[in-house]
Amino acid sequence: LNPYEIVKQQIDVAANILQLPSHVVEIVKRPKRVVSVSFPVKMDDGSVRIFEGFRSQHTDVLGPTKGGIRFHPDVTMDEVKALSMWMTFKCGVVGLPYGGGKGGVICDVKTMSRGEVERVSRGFMEAIADVVGPEKDIPAPDVYTNPQVMGWMMDTYSRIKGFYSPGVITGKPLIVGGSKGRNEATAQGCVYAIIADRKSTRLNS
């Protein structure tokens, strides 16, 4: 199923329960901004390959958009749109002052060298540098991206802007301003959710 169609169906269900006005529903169903980019990367064999990527920013009503960047051969625009919307909802549920963002590059890192992954990382950041930033949109790691990729992207953004800007990216290596515990944070959050669910189940049984 198309993830963008799925999230729109979920919004319809929630809107019906909450009795939201139709114009609010239509606003929520559409990301504020979706950027599609293509950029050249020199491969190890000397050839030049064009990569495609996307960045979706769902809403910045509560603050900058926030969400991961994934490297995967199956990345689509509809996927990143849906994921950016789910990020908005996740931030809203826990009261974080962020909207949802998500991005991705169509590539298969399993077939690429470290140098090629670095050049793709830097090339994508160069392509989206005008629409991200500490006060605009803050990317993070996701599928097949990691602290090293975030470090390359942060370095590229800082070079473009002319000043050191660690706030543009989360999930960076500690040595360049990353946060302790970031690698374990998602799994730890799942643990807390399971514990809370078990407590709730016992209370309601």
Residue ranges: model-predicted function:
Residues 199-205:
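Conserved small/polar residues in nucleotide/adenosyl-binding loops
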Residues 1-185, 191-193:
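N-terminal ligand-binding/catalytic initiation module
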